[in-house]
UniProtKB/Swiss-Prot annotation:
InterPro entries: At2g31720-like (IPR005508), DNA-bd_pseudobarrel_sf (IPR015300). GO terms for cellular component: nucleus. The keyword Transcription regulation applies. Residues 33-133 bind DNA. This is B3 domain-containing protein At2g32645.
Length: 189
């Protein structure tokens, strides 16, 4: 991002790589709309271009730069496609170059990479696929949440009102183990 004089970084998705993302025959990286954490990363013009491409009104999507985990810059195109009834942002026209440049980095199925958007100094839409999140970091996050749950369970033995509140937040806490969102637990008195 620094090399591009980048600004306005936004976490788009914490993306797990699937077999289809690594398939050079498919030549694309897809990001399902329901996994996008910050949906306002496109300008009005970019949104219009992507929509027109999806409706087959225009041939091209939005040209973007993507910086891979090894700090290589690649020219790609961002589009949106409907696959199996769900909309996805899709990086095409250059995704195979990203795969080739990261062979020694060994992209593997189920590796998790944070995907960020940012603007270059000229305002061009750029993305950064940052180094993968080690499995130990995800494990540590899950252990921290589990410890919080155990601590709450010990403190909940006192009253039924608290137990009801805990049951509600217990569900929310387990959902948070797959994200990086913080849980807020409040008590009813």
């Amino acid at each position: 991002m620094r090399n591009e004089n980048g600004y306005n970084p936004k976490l788009i998705s914490t993306r797990e790589l699937f077999k289809s993302d690594l398939d050079k025959g498919k030549a694309r990286l897809q990001v399902p709309f329901n996994q996008v954490k910050t949906p306002d990363f496109l300008t009005e013009d970019e949104t219009r271009i992507i929509h027109e491409n999806a409706m087959k009104i225009r041939d091209d999507g939005v040209p973007v730069n993507l910086v891979d985990p090894r700090m290589n810059k690649h020219a790609l195109e961002l589009r949106k496609w409907k696959m199996k009834g769900n909309w996805n942002y899709v990086f095409v026209k250059g995704w195979n170059d990203v795969l080739d440049a990261n062979k020694s980095n060994s992209f593997k199925e189920k590796d998790v990479f944070p995907l960020w958007s940012f603007r270059s100094g000229t305002g061009k839409l750029c993305f950064a696929l940052t180094p993968k999140i080690p499995a130990t970091a995800l494990l540590q996050e899950n252990l921290a949440v589990a410890a919080m749950v155990l601590l709450l369970e010990v403190n909940l033995v006192r009253t039924k009102e608290r137990e009801l509140v805990f049951l509600y937040y217990h569900k929310k806490i387990h959902q948070a183990t797959t994200t990086h969102n913080k849980c807020k637990v409040s008590w009813l008195y």
